[in-house]
Design a protein with these regions (language model features):
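Small beta-barrel nucleic-acid-binding modules, primarily SNase/OB-fold domains
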Residues: 2-213
Length: 213
């Protein structure tokens, strides 16, 4: 009886893996674009692009971040009405119940990477979802070199020192509350914001090291 249960569990696990594999080859229709990195599918799923972050659009009448509407427009041009394939990492949803995915067009292009390459998004690495970190970072470095999109403005001041956390891939102002909590083994010092972005670290949302004081 115990042997049969083990066999049953093995078959169940294999079937779940097979169904996930099939899901990764299915295409879904995008019916709406919220902003540069979030879309709505026809099946009702709200999808947040994994591994990247685009400038925030303010929906309360205040000023949106630099290039926010350009990022949304480009995302709309690529994805709105398109059939897309979702590829998942280790986590499938975030705390807001949004589906986390790398989104591929029918021609094989990854929307996440296209946004980064155009300089309309930066790499944001959140463990354990690091499957395409290297690819996205390669796209980011090319965009930085060419000073396109957000990089034409974001890296204007390259000289400010900042502290990075190897565990979270975030960088902070030296006086940030979170910077002071970084353990020595995870602490990395950057000579500039430029260096932090070049290594694939993203800015702390509390101390906002990319914003001039």
């Amino acid at each position: 009886m115990r042997f049969k249960k083990i066999i049953f569990l093995i078959i169940l696990i294999l079937l779940q893996g097979f169904s996930l594999s099939l899901a990764s080859f299915a295409f879904h229709r995008v019916v709406s674009v919220y902003d540069g990195d979030t879309v709505l599918l026809k099946n009702g799923a709200k999808v947040r692009y994994l591994g990247i972050n685009t400038p925030e659009i303010d929906h309360e009448g205040n000023k949106s971040e630099f290039m926010a509407h350009t990022a949304k427009d480009f995302n709309q041009k690529l994805a709105n009405g398109a059939l897309v394939r979702l590829e998942f990492d280790l986590e499938k949803k975030d705390r807001y119940k949004r589906v986390l995915a790398y989104v591929f067009l029918q021609n094989g292009d990854m929307v996440n990477a296209l946004l980064v390459r155009k300089g309309l998004a930066y790499v944001i690495s959140i463990r354990p979802n690091l499957k395409y970190r290297d690819l996205l970072l390669e796209c980011q470095r090319k965009a930085i070199k060419e000073s396109v999109g957000i990089w034409s403005n974001l890296l204007r001041d390259k000289g400010e020192n900042c502290l990075g956390n190897r565990r979270s891939y975030r960088f902070h102002r030296p006086d940030c509350h979170f910077a002071m909590k970084i353990s020595q083994k995870n602490l990395i010092k950057f000579r500039s914001i430029y260096d932090a972005f070049w290594e694939g670290y993203s800015p702390c949302k509390r101390c906002r090291p990319t914003v001039s004081r």
